[in-house]
């Protein structure tokens, strides 16, 4: 399969690229690195990416920024960061990318455990991740030509525990390699409209 991986240079993206590149033709995409570059907050950038890459069998996203901060001091501009990046950025990939997928192709997006287990300073993250679950479940009902869509929802990554020190007290972590296997299930499997929870 020809697979485009957005966010390929991140912790999850690197693991997913390693897992999928053994069997497939992978195009690595990042904001500033990779075979191609894209800004998922820009419709023009996303459109240009797909026009350049052409038709693919799978679109994989391991991308999306969020805002972490206390609700008491949060501004709408802070909250908008996660909406524009992880939520609308990935929705944009799906809405645009569907037209570049071959029949029977797939879209795999990423959310996270905070959709179900809120944390302190994580209001934006919980909102965005929960919204992505709703989008994937609904989109699966309407995508044509046998196109599938699923969502990967991992707990905190083992590789990122120190980075998010204090945000996930008592949460068990999971290595990125385990998350990559959930991506394989989505890309190489047959199911659609699912949330693949990893580590919880």
Language-model-detected regions and their locations in the chain:
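Catalytic loop of short-chain dehydrogenase/reductase
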Residues: 82-83, 91-93, 106-132, 136-141, ...
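C-terminal helical subdomain
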Residues: 144-147, 151-162, 166-200
